[in-house]
């Protein structure tokens, strides 16, 4: 699977693997920098995914509240 099509869960798993590798004292400086850079990109992608999900949830809550309000006003 390409990195562009990774699910949120797959990105989080990759981030966990990166952290484990960075904790390993035998990782070279060059590899550490590459891992850090990839981790930062994954972190940003996860943050965007979470913000989009939060917006969708908030939109759904607003829609539901409006539906309930409209239902209550038609009942009167």
UniProtKB/Swiss-Prot annotation:
Keywords: Cytoplasm, Exonuclease, Hydrolase, Nuclease
EC number: 3.1.11.6
Subcellular location: Cytoplasm
Single Gene Ontology MF annotation: exodeoxyribonuclease VII activity
GO cellular component terms listed in the entry, alphabetical order: cytosol; exodeoxyribonuclease VII complex
Catalytic activity: Exonucleolytic cleavage in either 5'- to 3'- or 3'- to 5'-direction to yield nucleoside 5'-phosphates
Keyword Nuclease listed: yes
InterPro entries: Exonuc_VII_S (IPR003761), Exonuc_VII_ssu_sf (IPR037004)
Gene Ontology annotations of biological process type: DNA catabolic process
UniProt key word Nuclease: yes
Quaternary structure and interacting proteins, as annotated: Heterooligomer composed of large and small subunits.
Family membership: Belongs to the XseB family.
Function per UniProt: Bidirectionally degrades single-stranded DNA into large acid-insoluble oligonucleotides, which are then degraded further into small acid-soluble oligonucleotides.
Protein name according to UniProt: Exodeoxyribonuclease 7 small subunit
Species this chain originates from: Staphylococcus aureus (strain MRSA252)
Source organism phylogeny: Bacteria, Bacillati, Bacillota, Bacilli, Bacillales
């Amino acid at each position: 699977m390409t990195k562009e099509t990774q699910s949120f869960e797959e990105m989080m798993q990759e981030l966990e693997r990166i952290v484990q590798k960075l904790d390993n004292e035998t990782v070279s400086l060059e590899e550490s920098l590459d891992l850090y850079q990839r981790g930062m990109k994954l972190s940003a992608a996860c943050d965007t995914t979470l913000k989009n999900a939060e917006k969708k949830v908030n939109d759904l809550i607003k829609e539901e509240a409006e539906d309930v309000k409209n239902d209550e006003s038609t009942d009167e």
